[in-house]
Amino acid sequence: MKILFFSHGKRANGGAERCLLDLVKGLKQARESWEIYVVFPAKDELWEMTRPYLSGYAFIRQPWWLVRPKKRNWQKRLLFNLKKHSAIRKTRDYIREIKPDITITNTLATPIGAIASHAENIPHDWFIHEIPELARNLTYLFCEDSCLEKISSLSQRILVPSDFAGKYYTNKLSSPEKIDVVYQSVEVNPLKRTEPGQSFTIGMLGNFEPNKGQHIAIEALREVVKKYPDTRLLLIGGNNSRYAQELEKRITEYNLRQNVSIVAHTVHPHDYLIQADAALVCSGFECFGRVIVEGLKCGLPVIVPDKPFGQELIKEGYNGFLYNRESSGDLAKKIILLRQTGHLPEMKQNALKSVENRFSIPTFAEDFISIINSKKV
């Protein structure tokens, strides 16, 4: 079996990219004879980390049909149309070179791989990790209905990472019978546990961007320290964005320098997360709650928004808490509740129990293999 994946990301800081890395590892472990190829947009850490498992790779920049809402204009549409022909041609050339049995686009962000596969008469599957309408950080460059129709028509199967995403796209796509849910793996191998006697610490893992909601965590911490001045917030995933600069200003303005620690993007985030007493998620939306599972696998209760992606994994008071994302005050109350509860050690054990024998690389790979070997009507 020869499989060709199309990746829109070059770094390993996104859920879709980390999913691809785990999937490539798992497939190679489960089916050593299979040949796996990936088209990356550029040479970077994702290429470096997946390379040991690949039979080949190519670097082809594929234009996106998902853009920031403020950049949805005729100029962007023109630029996409100008770039797509070259990208399709290069992708078709690579498909002819390696002759894959199946191709898989690992994102909703670009249709180039699907279009090229269709032109070369190669079966194509789409692995969708995004729901733009709900995330609101990206939007379709062209008419949403026409894009969704292309997704249906250019795919023999459409994979999604959660039951919630499956229900959403069942109501959106013209061929809902093509949809399969496959829960991805989350590999966590942290080095050490919390140091005895350290201040109560909340860990938050995620790239610094508005949808991830680091600003909400800071607003909540501002309230928490009024009651518990020693509470610490560990933010993992820092970058040099304008949003990150705004967070820095807010931390200074609120006099929280002694309470907030920032760790830049790292390929080993769990070594930091496991130092916390609990994990926090402030995302407005997640197609799959990967960061929630990461917290649970680190043995941490997780405080998450009271939304479908949180409700699917967290049971109130058992392995975490749910809160109203529109209210930093409600989040502050849940953090204080976690500090005051006498059941924190028990909740940590429950966190591990709730993901025991779940979300493993071997299971992910076998589920994926079963799906791609199945016949769609």
Q: PLM ranges: what are they?
A:
Residues 265, 284:
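Aromatic "clamp/platform" in nucleotide-sugar-dependent glycosyltransferases that forms part
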Residues 164, 185:
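Carbohydrate-associated surface elements
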Residues 38-45, 186, 205, 232-246:
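Glycosyltransferase donor-sugar binding loop
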Residues 316-317, 321-328, 337-342:
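Conserved acidic donor-binding segment of nucleotide-sugar-dependent glycosyltransferases
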Residues 301-305:
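Short hydrophobic beta-strand element within catalytic cores of glycosyltransferases
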Residues 343-358, 367-370:
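A short, well-ordered alpha-helix in the C-terminal region of glycosyltransferases
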Residues 86-87, 123-125, 131-154:
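Nucleotide-sugar donor phosphate/pyrophosphate-binding loop at the beta->alpha transition
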Residues 14-25, 200, 207-226, 245, ...:
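A conserved mid-protein helix/loop that constitutes part of the nucleotide-sugar donor-binding site
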